[in-house]
């Protein structure tokens, strides 16, 4: 019947086809000319000068040539087997409210996501566009960069080839197009989507789920940001880009990007400083939900705008806001990380302000082999947390202007596990290393040639409840080991210390450097001024008791004893600082051999 009855008389059906198309599309349709060709099982029809009219009767879309193929199957379902559009010109706009306008015609009406035209289009088996021109405008993308949506610029794509294939609840799309020269080279977009079994409107994009893919062999991302909603503000960058986007309910839910870009600058949130890279390559993935977000990298290598090099480590950050009775949650994981580069990047990530303050207060360098931190509650008052870190060539220095400066170190390898209940740490240091703990020793920093230490601690709430350690230290001044524990006392400001230390050798003239500030200033000055040079061997140190009572004047207060063998020691028994003004100096004792004991006072 198709070949013998319809094909020879196709011209007679033009008015009927116009009425059918008008009823199906939901807008007036005019067909200038119609002819048919009978080839094979599926006859084809060529339509020329097709016009779709808007509500005012003006042409909203003109198609110079359209080829339509039908079959018995398509006729029975009132659809087309194939629809081919040659050299069409289309205006496509994605409005700030999320509506789609094609040639000024709305796919869907206000308050409804359904559109007869969209349903018809996505119900055809195959739609092909050849050599078209598309003017693409995204108000939503323009609005996401902080501009007024009505000022969104149009991107004109030429030589546009599109293939759309629709099956039951499935839609596959491919678009190849050439952008303006300054924008980049010809690119490809692909999408594979499906709808739920209960979806009755193919054109309702809110029912669509699936994945979209884009490949840009050469692109200037500063132009891309005006036309594609990326979830981040890409300020500049040129190079090669591949994008994957997961679509849920017709909206971007998550995605990934393979990068090979130069001169990149992006801003993750308006209040943050831009992230800048001289060069960056690898994969970046992200997710932005209503109450959560995540960022991760795979084999990402870059040179920052400050010249810092990241050779290719992996890191991921996840954060969920508090909702009702559910606490905020966070997770940071990483491996093969450069800490200095990571700190620079982290200051530009949307992390809690408390974290930014901590990072600004510390200079950090080193390589992290593995890192994991998981927590619940506000980041500045974590209710539960646990983590572990394995780092090498570590340097941490407090650079805060505040007088409350914390400990620091350089040239360390650490392995630590910790939680809100406590933790443990293994520390190793070698040549040209140093330790710093302002407020603990006479001098801020202690140089290290070799150090091994095991440290354990317990926490009760936000308070340190107990500390235990074992350590071996060697440097130019001394070689020795110590073990002990510390715990707080309600009646003491400095707490209770139980320390045993053995110093195999020590430079007698440098001992004052290692005296704790818990000792009175008079004692520390006396040791510094009186012991000029010499060696101390077999030094035994014992401190036990309330540190507020050092040097333990009474036996009931505890123990305080330093005892060792002296060799070739020069000592000013009464240093000038202790003599009355104008007094003659006491003779210096030289070449002393014997035993020196400091016990209590």
Give each language-model segment a name.
Residues 26, 58, 63, 80, ...:
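Surface-exposed or flexible loop/turn and strand-edge residues in extracellular/cell-surface modules
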Residues 72, 106-228, 235-240, 246-248, ...:
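Elongated, acidic membrane-bridging lipid-handling scaffolds
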Residues 27-28, 44, 48-166, 182, ...:
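Secondary-structure transition motifs
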Residues 1-26:
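N-terminal type II signal-anchor transmembrane helix
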Residues 84, 91, 258, 263-296, ...:
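Outer-membrane beta-barrel translocator/pore domains, especially the C-terminal barrels
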Residues 33-42:
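Short edge beta-strands and adjacent turn/loop segments
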Residues 80-82, 124-126, 207-211, 252-256, ...:
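Outer-membrane beta-barrel architecture
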Residues 70-74, 113, 197, 246-249, ...:
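Outer-membrane beta-barrel proteins
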């Amino acid at each position: 019947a198709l070949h013998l009855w319809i094909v020879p008389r196709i011209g007679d059906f033009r008015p009927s086809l116009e009425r059918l198309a008008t009823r199906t599309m939901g807008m007036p349709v005019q067909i200038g000319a119609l002819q048919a060709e009978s080839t094979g099982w599926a006859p084809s029809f060529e339509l020329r000068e097709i016009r779709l009219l808007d509500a005012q009767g003006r042409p909203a879309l003109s198609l110079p040539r359209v080829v339509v193929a039908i079959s018995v199957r398509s006729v029975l379902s009132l659809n087309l087997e194939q629809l081919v559009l040659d050299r069409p010109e289309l205006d496509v706009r994605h409005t700030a409210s999320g509506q789609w306008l094609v040639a000024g015609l709305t796919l869907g009406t206000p308050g409804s996501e359904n559109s007869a035209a969209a349903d018809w289009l996505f119900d055809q088996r195959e739609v092909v566009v050849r050599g078209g021109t598309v003017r693409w405008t995204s108000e939503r993308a323009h609005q996401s960069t902080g501009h007024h949506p009505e000022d969104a610029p149009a991107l004109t794509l030429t030589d546009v080839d599109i293939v759309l294939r629709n099956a039951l609840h499935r839609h596959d799309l491919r678009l190849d197009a050439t952008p303006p020269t300054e924008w980049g080279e010809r690119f490809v977009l692909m999408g594979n989507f499906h709808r739920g079994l209960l979806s009755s409107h193919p054109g309702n994009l809110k029912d669509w789920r699936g994945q979209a893919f884009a490949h840009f062999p050469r692109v200037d991302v500063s132009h891309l940001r005006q036309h594609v909603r990326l979830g981040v503000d890409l300020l500049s960058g040129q190079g090669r880009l591949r994008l994957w986007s997961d679509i849920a309910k017709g909206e971007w839910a998550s995605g990934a990007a393979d990068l090979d870009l130069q001169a990149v600058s992006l801003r993750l949130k308006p209040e943050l400083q831009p992230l800048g890279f001289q060069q960056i390559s690898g994969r970046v993935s992200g997710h932005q939900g209503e109450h959560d977000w995540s960022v991760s990298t795979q084999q990402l290598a870059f040179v920052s705008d400050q010249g810092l090099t990241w050779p290719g480590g992996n890191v991921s950050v996840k954060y969920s806001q508090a909702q009702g009775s559910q606490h905020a949650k966070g997770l940071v994981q990483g491996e093969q990380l450069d800490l200095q580069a990571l700190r620079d990047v982290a200051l530009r990530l949307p992390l809690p302000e408390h974290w930014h303050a901590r990072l600004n207060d510390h200079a950090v360098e080193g390589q992290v082999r593995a890192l994991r931190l998981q927590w619940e509650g506000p980041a500045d008052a974590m209710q539960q947390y646990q983590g572990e870190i394995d780092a090498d060539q570590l340097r941490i220095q407090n650079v805060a202007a505040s007088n409350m400066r914390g400990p620091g170190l350089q040239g360390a390898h650490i392995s630590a596990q910790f939680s809100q209940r406590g933790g443990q740490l293994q520390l190793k240091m070698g040549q040209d290393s140093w330790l710093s703990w302002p407020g603990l020793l006479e001098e801020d920093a202690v140089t290290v040639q070799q150090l091994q230490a095991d440290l354990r601690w317990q926490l009760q709430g936000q308070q340190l409840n107990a500390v235990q350690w074992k350590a071996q230290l060697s440097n130019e001044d001394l070689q020795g080991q110590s073990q002990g524990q510390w715990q707080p006392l309600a009646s003491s400001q400095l707490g209770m210390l139980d320390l045993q230390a053995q110093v195999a050798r020590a430079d007698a003239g440098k001992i004052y450097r290692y005296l704790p500030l818990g000792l009175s200033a008079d004692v520390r000055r006396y040791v510094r001024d009186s012991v000029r040079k010499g060696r101390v061997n077999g030094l035994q140190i014992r401190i036990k008791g309330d540190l507020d009572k050092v040097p333990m004047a009474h036996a009931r207060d505890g123990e305080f004893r330093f005892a060792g063998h002296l060799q070739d020691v020069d000592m000013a028994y009464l240093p000038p600082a202790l003599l009355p003004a104008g007094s003659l100096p006491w003779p210096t004792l030289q070449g002393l051999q014997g035993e020196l004991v400091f016990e209590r006072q």
